Design a protein with these regions (language model features):
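Long, contiguous binding/interaction regions
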Residues: 1-75
Length: 75
């Protein structure tokens, strides 16, 4: 995971579009459950997930909680 102080970002790679979209849908479910939504950059076999809290223009505990939940999807 990388952070620049304003964003928590991780790139995930998958062996095809279907697996990528299954991951994206799981991320969406987590985001809706938490009421906290990441920026997603999706392409064939990859997805970059970026968390930030716009209200504080930076990171909060919720960003780290959501990122950890998404990490559990692939570990």
């Amino acid at each position: 995971m990388s952070t620049d102080g304003k964003w928590l970002s991780r790139r995930f790679e998958f062996p095809g579009f279907g697996r990528t979209m299954a991951f994206v849908n799981a991320v969406a479910w987590i985001a809706e459950s938490e009421g906290h939504h990441p920026d997603l950059d999706v392409g064939y076999g990859r997805c970059v997930v970026q968390w930030s809290t716009h209200a504080v223009d930076g990171l909060t505990e919720n960003d780290f909680i959501c990122a950890a939940k998404v990490d559990c999807l692939v570990e």
